[in-house]
């Protein structure tokens, strides 16, 4: 029954205890007619989400579709899923993002542009050659953390091919309306120490 937010009532939600994360969860549960106070919050220290939910049927975990859900599929672990952005489009925020120092951007704009051009080239290679890109990642892992997860890496890369650019004009482009919708909500809910305001915190000026 955890295929809808209200179904989290009486269950255990594994949280990173981030104010924004918890406010988003509260929003979708209440929007679905649920009572957020009936969702038990416990600290999230899980590293293998698929195995955790297999062993703990009452657990709900915030995961990345392109990794954890694919891992669950590979390991044949049945799961209920809730896609937050489908329930509230405001929560379709950009993740991950590249962060730069304002003074650096002002003083060395050409370096920033060159860095983004090189980064774009790498992403485009991954889009055009997902299997090769996955193998490069596997071969470059000198920590051993990906050992035994080679198939997961490859299937994840196949999924991410359609996510790197998605509906954007080009790689790296940030749609102001989409950006503002989320951070206006953060401002409205007073979830950050300072308000951001419209069209702040991002730039498309350094993209080729």
Please state what every model-predicted region is.
Residues 179-208:
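Conserved C-terminal helix/tail region of periplasmic/extracytoplasmic solute-binding proteins
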């Amino acid at each position: 029954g955890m295929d809808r937010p209200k179904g989290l009532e009486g269950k255990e939600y594994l949280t990173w205890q981030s104010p924004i994360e918890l406010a988003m969860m509260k929003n979708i549960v209440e929007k679905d007619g649920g009572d957020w106070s009936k969702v038990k919050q416990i600290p999230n220290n899980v590293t293998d989400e698929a195995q955790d939910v297999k062993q703990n049927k009452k657990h709900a975990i915030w995961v990345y579709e392109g990794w954890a859900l694919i891992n669950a599929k590979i390991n044949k672990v049945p799961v209920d899923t809730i896609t937050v952005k489908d329930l509230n489009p405001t929560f379709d925020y950009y993740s991950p993002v590249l962060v730069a120092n304002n003074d650096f951007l002002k003083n060395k704009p050409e370096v920033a542009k060159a860095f983004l051009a090189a980064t774009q080239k790498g992403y485009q290679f991954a889009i055009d050659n997902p299997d090769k890109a996955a193998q490069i990642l596997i071969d470059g892992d000198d920590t051993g953390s990906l050992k035994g997860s080679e198939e997961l890496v490859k299937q994840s890369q196949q999924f991410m091919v359609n996510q790197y650019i998605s509906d954007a004009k080009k790689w790296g482009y940030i749609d102001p309306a989409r950006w503002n919708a989320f951070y206006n909500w953060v401002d409205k809910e007073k979830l950050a120490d300072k308000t951001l305001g419209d069209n702040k915190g991002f730039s498309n000026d350094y993209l080729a």
